[in-house]
């Protein structure tokens, strides 16, 4: 035979606590103007400051990227100018060398 265990479900129920109501009468403290200023304006000023900082840093990052790409383009153009001048100088040297070679060949071998 099974015996029933004594279980007290009253422990597990939620107790109702009476709600205390605030009384809006002359006993309530006066809030200082200093605190009221921050209560009224802290959130809007914070939002404006946050948006201003986000905009500033976002535009600064964009400027850094654009400046870096501009500097890279300037370096590439300078490098291209140097390469072209080098190739022109080497071409002139080669042609001068060939002309000199042809002249000396003509001097030593007039039959050609």
UniProtKB/Swiss-Prot annotation:
Coiled coil: none annotated. The chain crosses the membrane at residues 45-62. It is found in: Mitochondrion inner membrane. One of its GO terms (cellular component) is INA complex. Signal peptide: none annotated. Residues 25-44 are mitochondrial matrix. Keywords: Chaperone, Membrane, Mitochondrion, Mitochondrion inner membrane, Transit peptide, Transmembrane, Transmembrane helix. It is a single-pass membrane protein. Residues 63-112 are mitochondrial intermembrane. GO terms for biological process: mitochondrial proton-transporting ATP synthase complex assembly. Residues 1-24 form a transit peptide. Component of the INA complex (INAC) that promotes the biogenesis of mitochondrial F(1)F(0)-ATP synthase. INAC facilitates the assembly of the peripheral stalk and promotes the assembly of the catalytic F(1)-domain with the membrane-embedded F(0)-domain. Component of the inner membrane assembly (INA) complex. Interacts with a subset of F(1)F(0)-ATP synthase subunits of the F(1)-domain and the peripheral stalk. Belongs to the INA17 family. This is Inner membrane assembly complex subunit 17. It comes from Schizosaccharomyces pombe (strain 972 / ATCC 24843).
